[in-house]
Regions:
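Residues that scaffold the ATP/ADP-binding catalytic core of kinase and kinase-like folds
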Residues: 33, 49, 137
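Charged phosphate-binding loop/patch that engages nucleotide di/tri-phosphates or the phosphate backbone
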Residues: 131-155
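Active-site-adjacent beta-strand/loop module that shapes the phosphate/pyrophosphate-binding cleft
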Residues: 78-115, 127, 149
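Non-DNA-binding regulatory cores of transcription-related proteins
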Residues: 118-124
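Membrane-topology and secretion signals of cell-surface/extracellular proteins
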Residues: 34-36, 40, 66, 85-87, ...
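The catalytic Nudix box helix
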Residues: 41-76, 130
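N-terminal strand-loop-strand
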Residues: 1-41, 90
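Short, charged/polar surface micro-motifs in flexible loops or helix N-caps
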Residues: 15-18, 28-31, 47-48, 83-84, ...
Length: 155
């Protein structure tokens, strides 16, 4: 079985209290009531023959509705999530209105075994978080990406 790989973008900006990062909350019934440890950087899976950086930019646009125009990307490397999925990320400096984020959607059977298909957004909301709060919101393995971001910017 090929390992599942995804690629994403850590969008960051200077906020009043220091660095802030944009995180997205997954849509759909499974995630509806989950908050701490449920948020993610905008990301998505890519095929083995696909360029991960191109995938990261495409997925960012699909999940936020915003295209990053010629961003200068800082490579943050890869982390492995609990289920074994590898996430490769790049950081980009930028700003967007988190309240205006609109993502693509997916279809699934809901409620389970009902035979009814429902459509849900890939991302139901996005928000800017200061680093300390972002660390509590992010899926565990992705916290390492924030540490790497801070290191890269400090150089």
């Amino acid at each position: 079985v090929a390992r599942r790989r995804s690629a994403g973008i850590v969008l960051y900006r200077a906020g009043d209290g220091g660095l802030e990062v944009l995180l997205v909350h997954p849509g759909g019934p499974f995630w509806a009531k989950k908050d701490l440890g449920a948020w993610s950087i905008p990301k998505g899976e890519y095929e083995p023959d696909e360029d991960p950086q191109a995938c990261a930019l495409r997925e960012f646009e699909e999940e936020t509705g915003t295209r990053l125009a010629a961003p200068e990307l800082l490579e943050l490397g890869a982390v492995t999530q609990r289920a074994g999925k590898e996430v490769t990320a790049w950081a980009a400096r930028g700003d967007l209105d988190a309240a205006a984020v609109r993502s693509n959607s997916f279809t699934m059977e809901w409620p389970p075994r009902s035979g009814r298909e429902q459509e849900f957004p890939e991302v139901d909301r996005a928000a800017w978080f200061a680093l300390d709060e972002a660390r509590t919101k992010l899926v565990g393995a992705q916290v390492e990406l924030l540490d790497r971001l801070v290191e890269r910017i400090a150089r």
